Amino acid sequence: MEYTGSEYKGERLHGRLEGKGEYILPTETRYEGEMKDGMFHGQGTLFFPNGSKYVALWDHGIALQGKYTFADGLEYDKEDWRYCDQYDRRFYTEICDGLKPAGRSQLTDLDPPRKIPDGCYDCGDGFYNPLTRVVNDYQHKFLRNADDDEHEWIIQKCRKGWDETTGYRPKQSQSTKT
């Protein structure tokens, strides 16, 4: 663990992580639960630095079933995910606390929203710099490098740190396209 920057407190068997324990990754994500032969095995929970958590049943490091809960208490539902979709654009705090009056609309679930550094995007767990393709957490510590799919998703879907004036864009018909 000294090589990875991880930390483990818990039971061992023949020098291997085995039984109940707490495993802390260098990103400060923490696993509490059962281990077998050095892997998550049995009931266990991942606690993320942003306050969210994933409670799961693990089999040799693979989550067989689990439930993700965001820091604000919203639970992810894989089958019927209706949060902030085309039918209901409210953030979870607006669902719980009601909408704000006109002129004070929320830009994010967090109100007031975080200030995004110039040239970056807020991707939900940190700020993304498209030039370096690096995601840093909100305290500006490295989280990960974005692959091509995540890069495209962030560019298309996430809030950016600058304003763009787009103006009216009439829908072009097929005959007027060049």
Swiss-Prot record:
Signal peptide: none annotated. The keyword RNA-binding does not apply. Pfam families: MORN. It is found in: Cell projection, Cilium, Flagellum. GO terms for cellular component: sperm flagellum. The keyword Repeat applies. InterPro entries: MORN, Morn5. Keywords: Cell projection, Cilium, Flagellum, Repeat. MORN repeats lie at residues 8-30, 31-53, 54-75. PANTHER family: MORN REPEAT-CONTAINING PROTEIN 5. This is MORN repeat-containing protein 5. The gene is morn5.
